[in-house]
C-alpha cells in the first residue's frame, strides 16, 4: 500500500510531496522554495521573512470571516539520522516511506513525521476549498531541530492572529500547554599526544543497536546513552590495564539520545587477553542491566591497525573520569505536574580526534533557575578537567496557562468527540511556543498532534489511525474558533 492512498488523502499526499524534498536543518533552501511555490500557486499571500520562515495567509471561509485569526505553525526542517548499515544521502534523496499495518515509517532513516505531518496538515488546509476555517496565518519555521533560529528571529509584526495552534505534539490524546527551555553546552580540550609505546596492541570497540530517541521526550525512558556506556567500559578497562585512547566517536545530533559509539584504544600486548575478557564482562553486565529496555544491544570488539600516536595516559584518564562524572538523564522531576520531567541533560556528542577532545550536550528545564543550575553543573564538570566551555542557544520555556480560552474550547471538543478527557500536559521538549510567545505576547497558544514514536531516530513512525483522529479534531477546532 502507498502512503498516497491513505486517509485523509490530501494530508498524506502533501506529506509525500514534502518528504520528496531534502530538508535538513541549516539547509532548508529547497523546502523554502517548495513552500513559497506552493503558496503562490494557490494564489495566496505568500512571503518569506528575513531569516527564511515562510508565511502564507488565507482569508476565512464563507461565514467565518469575522472569527479570530488563527496562526497555524509547524517547522520545515527534520532530523536526519540513519542506521549505521543504511546507505542514504539526505542531501540528495527523498525519504523512502513504508506502510506497516497501522504505521508509516521509513527504510532505515528518520521519517520526518516530526514535524512534516504538521506541515502537511496546514498545507491540506490552505489548499482546500471546502474546509470550514477562520482567517489563517500559516507560519512555517526553519531550523527548529538545531537551534530554533526561525522562531527566535521571526517578526511578530507580520501577524495579527490571536490564537496559535502548534502542530508539533506527539500523542493524540494530549493538549500541550507548556514546554521546557534549553541551552547547549559545547566543550573542547587539546590533549597531549604521545608516540605509541612499543609492544602495544590496538582494539576497536563498537556499540550499536540502542534505541536512541528524543533527548527530551524520551529522557525518562531509561534508554542507554552510547557515549556514557563507552566511557564506562573504557574506565573499567583502564583500572586493570594501561589503556590509552586512540580515538573516540559517539553520538550525532545535539537533541538525540546517542545510539552508537566507537573507539580505538591501545593496551599493552601482554595484557590483551585480560582486556578482551574485561570487554566481554562489561558487555555482559550492560546486557543484563538493559535487557528489558534495549533489546538490540550490540557491543563488539576486534583487533585493528596501529596508530602512530595516542592520547597520553594523563589526558586519557581526564577524559574518562570527566565523561563518567558528567550528568546525563533526568536531573529533577516536576514537583507540581505528575510524571513531568522538569530538568535534564543529555551528553549527545563525544569526539576525540587529532588530539582534540570535544563534546556537545543539551540541558533542558521548564524552570529557568533550575536550567541555570544544570547548565552550571555540566560546565563545572568539564571545566574541572581544563576544558574550554561555551554555552549557547539559550531559549525560554513556555509557561502553562490553565485558564487559556483555546484550551477550554479544545478540552470540551475532545470530550464531545471521544467521550473522555484529553491529557492536558506540559512537555519536556523545546517546542517553539516558548520562543514564539516572546514575539506574540498576546497569542493564546496550544500544541497538539498525532501519535509519533521514536522521533529523531531511524525507528521513527507515525500512526495512521491517529493521524485521522488528529485531523478530525483539528477540523472541529477550526470550526469552533470564536468571533473577534
Predicted feature locations:
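Active-site-adjacent substrate-binding region
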Residues: 218, 225-227, 232-248, 400-443
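Acidic, glycine-rich active-site loops and adjacent beta-strand->loop/helix elements
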Residues: 76-78, 139-147, 169-172, 211, ...
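Midchain, well-structured core segments that form catalytic/ion-binding scaffolds
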Residues: 102-105, 145-146, 152-364
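Substrate-recognition/cap regions that form aromatic- and gly/pro-loop-enriched pockets
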Residues: 340-429
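Active-site metal-coordination/substrate-binding segment of hydrolases
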Residues: 64-135, 140-146, 151-155, 161-162, ...
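Acidic/His- and Gly-rich active-site-bordering loop/insert found
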Residues: 2-102
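Zn-dependent metallopeptidase/amidohydrolase metal-coordination segment
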Residues: 11, 335, 342-355, 362, ...
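His/Asp/Glu-rich mid-to-C-terminal helical/loop segments that flank catalytic regions of hydrolases
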Residues: 157, 223-240, 269-272, 318-324, ...
